[in-house]
UniProtKB/Swiss-Prot annotation:
The lineage of its organism: Bacteria, Pseudomonadati, Pseudomonadota, Gammaproteobacteria, Pseudomonadales. This is Large ribosomal subunit protein bL17. Belongs to the bacterial ribosomal protein bL17 family. It comes from Pseudomonas fluorescens (strain SBW25). HAMAP family: Ribosomal_bL17. Keywords: Ribonucleoprotein, Ribosomal protein. InterPro entries: Ribosomal_bL17 (IPR000456), Ribosomal_bL17_CS (IPR047859), Ribosomal_bL17_sf (IPR036373). Part of the 50S ribosomal subunit. Contacts protein L32.
Length: 128
């Protein structure tokens, strides 16, 4: 029985899942918008949102935890210097998942995952 077992297997081994979500989280924080399948997007929330919550309190221990989970110095810097400050007053819900149709080929449901308060291209141009 699978009672009280949370999370999706996504037809991968545990090490493959861990590596995949680590890479997806790094891509999300780097680009602030990624396109993936809907089940992966929903599971990515469970990895990425705690990292942003961790970044709201800047300490050496938290930076080391974030580096352990992302393995990227640049992303740790962005998390603590930019994203942690951006979401300091928000109590969670840092990601938005938007369904965007089905993939050609296997008809898999696709979704965009984006950071909630990200600067869009139009806002960046109008700010200048």
């Amino acid at each position: 029985m699978r009672h009280r077992k949370s999370g999706r297997h996504l037809s991968r081994t545990s090490s493959h899942r861990k590596a995949m979500f680590q890479n997806m989280a790094v891509s999300l924080f780097e680009h602030e918008l990624i396109k993936t399948t809907l089940p992966k997007a929903k599971e990515l929330r469970r990895v990425a949102e705690p990292l942003i919550t961790l970044a709201k309190t800047d300490s050496l221990a938290n930076r080391r935890l974030a580096f352990d989970r992302t393995r990227s110095k640049a992303i740790v810097g962005k998390l603590f210097n930019d994203l942690g400050k951006r979401y300091a007053t928000r109590e969670g819900g840092y990601l938005r998942i938007l369904k965007c149709g089905f993939r050609a080929g296997d008809n898999a449901p696709m979704a965009y995952v984006e950071l909630v308060d990200r600067a869009t291209a139009g806002e960046a141009v109008s700010a200048e």
